[in-house]
């Protein structure tokens, strides 16, 4: 499972 940049969701 590859998430679409979890960092962007965190911000």
From Swiss-Prot:
Taking the first listed entry, what is the main subcellular location of this protein, grouped into a coarse class?
secreted
UniProt KW keywords: Amidation, Pyrrolidone carboxylic acid, Secreted
- Lysine amide PTM positions read 11
| Tissue and organ expression note | Expressed by the venom gland.
Spell out which residues are annotated as carrying Pyrrolidone carboxylic acid.
1
- On whether Secreted is a keyword of this UniProt record, the answer is yes
Instruction: List the subcellular locations.
Output: Secreted
List the GO cellular component terms: extracellular region
Organism superkingdom:
Eukaryota
Note whether Isomerase occurs among the keywords: no
Question: What does the further note read?
Answer: Is a minor component of B.maculifrons venom.
Q: What is this protein called?
A: Peptide Bm-10
Q: Which organism is it from?
A: Batozonellus maculifrons (Solitary wasp)
């Amino acid at each position: 499972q590859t998430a679409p940049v979890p960092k962007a969701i965190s911000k």
